[in-house]
UniProtKB/Swiss-Prot annotation:
It comes from Caulobacter vibrioides (strain NA1000 / CB15N). Transfers and isomerizes the ribose moiety from AdoMet to the 7-aminomethyl group of 7-deazaguanine (preQ1-tRNA) to give epoxyqueuosine (oQ-tRNA). One of its GO terms (biological process) is tRNA wobble guanine modification. This is S-adenosylmethionine:tRNA ribosyltransferase-isomerase. NCBIfam families: PRK00147.1, queA. It is an enzyme of class 2 (transferase).
């Protein structure tokens, strides 16, 4: 498969810069195999589910993972010895004091450089600023930052000095503000660790969750900490050559047992978002049994993949040539998704993290 197979024209004004208010008033496109697409709103979701269905959410919580600061001057002097403004997006925690991050400008950074994030008048290690050393440097602007703080103290420092890591297509249009601290977080988020929101979940309100439970739909929570790699474009012309960044996920024994029981009783597994789906697929064997999982996953789903768990997927509208558009094409069929996206663009649906949503029923013929 070629990357161009997943391209389409998306007008720039279709990318939402703010979420719908209230959250569940966003538009909702229902896509069933062999049927015409249907326009609804997210609050209609209970109408498409049955008692006994199991809804699976990702309860990760977004941390303010975008840090701005200065690379301190080097003793060598010269142009490279002067301080340089830098920006880091934390990607994955490696140790109590270490994070993998994407950092720019990458060409101005070397192993051993000191970086001061936040205020620049504090002492090293003081919460007045956040200090780190570049311990490793890799391709694509990825570095390992060794902070002077560790554990809970580092968490506090990041919370004080970091900004919410809005996706590039939104950040290019406007800066992060205080509204995003609430808007870019699901109402059920509880496990700190993501640098991007599981955006399908942003549409849920406490009232909608109660209506789902009243319908007899069970609610289950798994955790996948979404990394900054979710923002990276595919750079290979041949799709199979692309490599995903690993992300940590967890499915408990209790959740695995509950999902297996729901399926055995005839209920459908409904994944809220691609992160929930990717994690469940990683935790499920070829026999279709969900098992406890606590590990990293770099699963990359493209057309031809045989799904083991999910029957229905709720997901936002994704960007051209993205790994997520490849995933939904694998789930609901490439031609069906092209037709659905053409309809969405023509009728004014809003795309991407703060945009509208869709409900996809799996096409078993894919």
């Amino acid at each position: 498969m070629r990357l161009s197979d997943f391209d389409f024209d998306l007008p720039e004004d279709r990318i939402a810069l703010r979420p719908a208010e209230p959250r569940d008033s966003a538009r909702f496109l229902v896509v069933r195999p062999g049927q015409a697409v249907a326009d609804h709103i997210v609050s209609d979701l209970p109408d498409f589910l049955r008692p006994g269905d199991a809804l699976v959410f990702n309860d990760t919580r977004v941390i303010p993972a975008r840090l701005s600061g200065l690379r301190e001057g080097r003793t060598t002097g010269g142009a490279d010895g002067t301080p340089v403004a830098v920006e880091a997006t934390l990607h994955r925690r490696l140790a109590p004091d270490r994070w993998s991050a994407f950092m720019r400008p990458g060409k101005r950074l070397k192993v051993g450089d000191r970086v001061a994030f936040g205020g620049h008048e504090g002492r090293v290690g003081d919460l007045g600023r956040l200090d780190a050393v570049i311990a490793e440097k890799h391709d694509g602007g990825e570095v390992v930052l060794a902070f002077d703080l560790s554990g809970p103290d580092l968490d506090v420092g990041i919370a004080q000095h970091g900004d919410m890591p809005l996706p590039p297509y939104i950040a290019a249009k406007r800066g992060e503000d205080e509204r995003d601290r609430a808007d870019y977080q699901t109402v059920y988020a509880r496990e700190d660790g993501s640098v991007a929101a599981p955006t399908a979940g942003l549409h849920f309100t406490p009232q909608l969750l109660e209506r789902l439970k009243a319908k007899g739909v069970s609610l289950h929570f798994v955790t996948l900490h979404v990394g900054a790699g979710t923002f990276l474009p595919v750079k290979t012309d041949e799709v199979s050559e692309h490599r995903m960044h690993a992300e940590y996920g967890q499915v408990t024994q209790e959740i695995a047992d509950a999902l297996n029981a729901a399926r055995a009783a005839g209920g459908r597994i409904v994944c809220v978002g691609t992160t929930s789906l990717r994690l469940l697929e990683s935790a499920t064997g070829e026999d279709g049994i969900v098992r406890p999982f606590a590990d990293e996953t770099a699963i990359f789903i493209t057309p031809g993949y045989r799904f083991r768990t999910a029957d229905v997927l709720m997901t936002n509208f994704h960007l051209p040539k993205s790994t997520l558009f490849m995933l939904v094409s694998a789930f609901a069929g490439t031609e069906a998704m092209r037709a659905a996206y053409e309809h969405a663009i023509a009728t004014g649906y809003r795309f991407y993290s703060y945009g509208d949503s869709s409900l996809l029923f799996k096409d078993e013929t894919c």
